[in-house]
């Protein structure tokens, strides 16, 4: 459950370490984002010589949440931290070339197959 002002870890090698959600996209008064949703973020902490820098405003897709994802069989997949993967603002393509940590099967639609293929583990 990601909302405005939520701090997230970054699960790719784009150069950002911590980001903050500034808007949940998809509806005029949408409050929460879940796994697979696109959010608008600003970078709060970045490494030197990365592809992005502190203060950049980008889009990101949520790949892990502490709240978890409920499956149709009743099971719930939860993670220890909230994490996202950064996307290009215009084309919504993945900025990084590697994904760190597991991602959920809920990302498996045409838009995020790139994230699924780069991820080391799909739960």
Curated annotation (Swiss-Prot):
One of its GO terms (cellular component) is cytosolic large ribosomal subunit. CDD domains: Ribosomal_uL14. It comes from the Bacteria. GO terms for molecular function: large ribosomal subunit rRNA binding; structural constituent of ribosome. Keywords: Ribonucleoprotein, Ribosomal protein, RNA-binding, rRNA-binding. GO terms for biological process: translation. Binds to 23S rRNA. Forms part of two intersubunit bridges in the 70S ribosome. Belongs to the universal ribosomal protein uL14 family. Part of the 50S ribosomal subunit. Forms a cluster with proteins L3 and L19. In the 70S ribosome, L14 and L19 interact and together make contacts with the 16S rRNA in bridges B5 and B8. This is Large ribosomal subunit protein uL14. It comes from Proteus mirabilis (strain HI4320). The lineage of its organism: Bacteria, Pseudomonadati, Pseudomonadota, Gammaproteobacteria, Enterobacterales.
């Amino acid at each position: 459950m990601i909302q405005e002002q939520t701090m997230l870890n970054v699960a790719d090698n784009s150069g950002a370490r911590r980001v903050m959600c500034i808007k949940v996209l998809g509806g005029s008064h949408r409050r929460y984002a879940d796994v697979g949703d696109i959010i608008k973020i600003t970078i709060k902490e970045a490494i030197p010589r990365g592809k992005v820098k502190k203060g950049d405003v980008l889009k990101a897709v949520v790949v892990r949440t502490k709240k978890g994802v409920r499956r149709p069989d009743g099971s719930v997949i939860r993670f220890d931290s909230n994490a996202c993967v950064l996307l290009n603002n215009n084309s919504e393509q993945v900025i990084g070339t590697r994904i760190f940590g597991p991602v959920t099967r809920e990302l498996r639609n045409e838009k995020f197959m790139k994230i699924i293929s780069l991820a080391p583990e799909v739960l």
